[in-house]
UniProtKB/Swiss-Prot annotation:
Native organism taxonomy: Bacteria, Bacillati, Bacillota, Bacilli, Bacillales
Role noted for this protein: Deamidates glutamine residues to glutamate on methyl-accepting chemotaxis receptors (MCPs). CheD-mediated MCP deamidation is required for productive communication of the conformational signals of the chemoreceptors to the CheA kinase.
InterPro entries: CheD-like_sf (IPR038592), Chemorcpt_Glu_NH3ase_CheD (IPR005659), Cytotoxic_necrot_fac-like_cat (IPR011324)
Organism field: Bacillus licheniformis (strain ATCC 14580 / DSM 13 / JCM 2505 / CCUG 7422 / NBRC 12200 / NCIMB 9375 / NCTC 10341 / NRRL NRS-1264 / Gibson 46)
The protein's Enzyme Commission number: 3.5.1.44
Record keyword Hydrolase present: yes
Catalysed reactions, as listed in the record: L-glutaminyl-[protein] + H2O = L-glutamyl-[protein] + NH4(+)
Keywords, comma-separated and alphabetical: Chemotaxis, Hydrolase
Gene: cheD
Quaternary data: Forms a complex with CheC.
Protein name listed in UniProt: Chemoreceptor glutamine deamidase CheD
PANTHER family noted in UniProt: CHEMORECEPTOR GLUTAMINE DEAMIDASE CHED-RELATED (PTHR35147:SF1)
Membership in a protein family: Belongs to the CheD family.
Keyword Hydrolase: yes
Short name of any one Pfam family annotated for the protein: CheD
């Protein structure tokens, strides 16, 4: 009798989107400029969530029905909730992230235009409030990124425009 192994799928996460995967599947997002790709995972459960965060703060939203994946202040908690519902343990969650670039340099000193760095700071703040450690990150700079996470190995592969591939 032959045992069938599940074929690996790569689940794609869009902009302002969040998805959860289990091994053997992997999860990927692209188009990370000032946006941040945040991966939360439980290595023992072989489960991970990836959220593609666009903006730091939902208070600027003009609609009452916000997309929680779009904003750092709502995306972190929403992803944690989804992972707990999928069987992960909060104390075992760890984080990796990439993105948060300054894609366009402005001559202004107004921090409001620095969306990438503000996204990174907002995510770090909310992870800290939930006591979730950041294991590694590749943030800042001025180049776009595509990331792919494997919940089996906890490796985050980062493809940076004109800079090649790194794994964290």
């Amino acid at each position: 009798m032959k045992i069938l192994e599940k074929e690996t799928s790569i689940i794609r996460v869009g902009i302002a989107d969040v998805k959860i995967v289990r091994t053997p599947d992997k999860i990927r997002t692209s188009g990370l400029g000032s946006c941040v790709g945040l991966v939360l995972y439980d290595l023992e459960a072989k489960t991970a969530g990836l959220v593609h965060v666009m903006l730091p703060d939902s208070s600027l939203s003009k609609t009452p029905d916000i997309n929680v994946a779009k904003y750092a202040d709502t995306a972190v908690e929403a992803t944690v909730k989804m992972l707990l519902e999928a069987g992960c343990r909060k104390y075992a969650l760890k984080a990796k992230m990439a993105g948060g670039a300054e894609m366009f340099k402005f001559k202004m000193t107004n921090d409001l235009m620095k969306v990438g760095p503000r996204n990174v700071l907002a995510i770090k703040k909310h992870l800290s409030l939930l006591n979730i450690p950041i294991v590694s990150e590749d943030t800042g700079g001025n180049s776009g990124r595509t990331i792919e996470f494997d919940p089996q190995s906890a490796e985050l592969v980062i493809r940076t425009v004109k800079q090649g591939v790194t794994t964290i």
